[in-house]
Amino acid sequence: FWEDARLEFNGTHVGRAAIRACYEDWINTKRAPVEGLRHMIYMPLIDLDGDHARTETYVDADAHTRRSGRTVLLRSLYRDRFAKRNGEWRFLEREIVPMRSLYDREDGN
């Protein structure tokens, strides 16, 4: 992530330190009770324009919680923007868009 990067995930986080703190909080609160995680990132759609790029990538993350044994099925979309500065590519923006799956239907079917 560039120092002026932005993350849209559980709020808006600007700057590398704020982004790191967001991920650390998520890992400590949401990831810690999970075991057997399968994080699958699909083929990204990439739009390259000089020193800037945009991508969209679908993601599946499936796991079991330790205490309840409940299966967790997460589907998301990563919308990313990258910038190349001084020959190096880094994230300029990441938006994590949660998506519903067939397993979250309100009617339970």
Feature map (PLM): residue ranges:
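A solvent-exposed, acidic/Ser-Thr-rich amphipathic alpha-helical stretch
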Residues: 1-60
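Extended, polar beta-sheet/loop recognition surfaces of beta-rich domains
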Residues: 14, 104-109
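Juxtamembrane/interface motifs at transmembrane-helix termini
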Residues: 17-19, 75-76, 109
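Residue-level detector of functional hotspots within protein domains
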Residues: 30-32, 68, 75
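Short, surface-exposed coil-to-beta transition loops
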Residues: 39-41, 73-78
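Short beta-strand edge/turn micro-motifs at domain boundaries
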Residues: 54, 75-105
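Beta-strand elements of well-folded, non-transmembrane domains
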Residues: 59-65, 82-84
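Short, cysteine-centered beta-strand-loop-beta hairpins and adjacent loop/turn segments enriched
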Residues: 62-72, 101
